[in-house]
Regions:
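C-terminal catalytic domains of large/alpha subunits in multi-subunit enzymes
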Residues: 1-59, 104-318
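Conserved strand-to-helix beginnings and helix N-cap segments that scaffold or border functional pockets
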Residues: 99-100
């Protein structure tokens, strides 16, 4: 077969570090592509005006901006004396859930629940020179910057907690469920008390961090390099019904097997996959960019550019 595996090399020279074969075989095993084809053929044999079709398609997508300088992000984290945490990053929340993931990063680093973390809207006064929220990289870049800022504050807090709980080293300490843990056992020192004690000792409870994706490069002259931090893989099986008399169609189902990696939030990631499916269907079936003879964009409004709506959503997404 011609599916990417870890022996292959992309046109830019970067070697594949994982493969698409797993998602293909697991998708086929879960949904039985051969049986779905059989069902479509049986339907078509007895239907005069409607026809069903089914296709199986793999995908491989590199994560990072190919313009290397864009692969950087900053985060500003404040811990207040009441124990609350504020985070600012360059990521723009537009319904895709990136702020939820960033809040999860801070909450995990400080051993808090999400109610204790507030992610503020993007503001160039707090976070300057931001990279675009695009290329499926916003959560990676800004989440990592948030992690780095939280780690710096946490280490300073551990230096205070070390004496309060009589730990031999800060390496023996952790923050879980609002308490300091020593050697994985909960102590009586809670988060708010630790923060206040640190403040009284004039410890810095704020941090600005900068993250740049390591190990990536791309030469636009030779079109060679290592432009992506990693690749994600997936496979989709799509079934459609075409009304041959009226020239209409419906998407009956989309069945996916996608590489999530270690998902921070499966609900957000499922939503991203479902949204991507509908966007892809729109791109392939109805969206068309039209320019006139003078080069002016004519499809510049919803009245001239058709985008997917509720009726475009597949009947089943699995």
């Amino acid at each position: 077969n011609n599916l990417t595996d870890d022996r292959d090399e992309f046109p830019c020279g970067q070697k594949a570090e994982s493969d698409a074969i797993t998602s293909w075989t697991q998708g086929d095993a879960a949904y039985d592509f051969t049986d779905l084809q059989k069902q479509a053929h049986e339907f078509n044999a007895s239907s005069k005006y409607f026809r069903k079709g089914v296709a199986m398609m793999p995908v491989c997508f590199g994560i990072s901006f190919t313009k290397t300088p864009m692969n950087q992000a900053r985060a500003l984290v404040h811990v207040y004396t009441d124990g609350s945490v504020a985070v600012s990053t360059g990521a723009v929340e537009m319904g895709q859930g990136v702020n939820t993931k960033i809040a999860q990063v801070a909450a995990k680093m400080f051993g808090l629940d999400l109610n204790g973390v507030k992610v503020h809207t993007t503001n160039t006064l707090r976070i300057a020179n931001t990279s675009p929220t695009a290329a499926s990289a916003a959560a990676d870049l800004n989440g990592k910057a948030t992690q780095m800022a939280c780690e710096a504050i946490r280490d300073r807090l551990f230096a205070v907690a070390k004496d309060l709980v009589e730990a031999k080293s800060i390496d023996n300490l952790s923050l879980e469920n609002g308490f300091v843990h020593r050697n994985s056992e909960r102590t009586s020192l809670d988060w708010k008390t630790l923060v206040m004690d640190a403040h009284l000792q004039r410890v810095n409870l704020s941090e600005h961090s900068h993250y740049a994706t390591p190990g990536i490069n791309f030469d636009w002259t030779t079109a060679k390099g290592h432009p992506f931090a990693y690749h994600v893989y997936g496979t989709a099986i799509v079934g459609v019904t075409v009304d041959c008399l009226r020239g209409r169609y419906e998407v009956d189902y989309v069945k996916c097997c996608h590489d999530f990696g270690s998902s921070m939030n499966t609900s957000v990631d499922y939503g991203q996959i479902e949204g991507g499916i509908v966007q892809g269907l729109g791109w392939m079936t109805m969206e068309e960019v039209v320019y006139d003879a003078d080069g002016k964009l004519r499809s510049n409004a919803l009245s001239t550019y058709k985008v997917p709506d509720i009726y475009s959503i597949p009947k089943e997404i699995a």
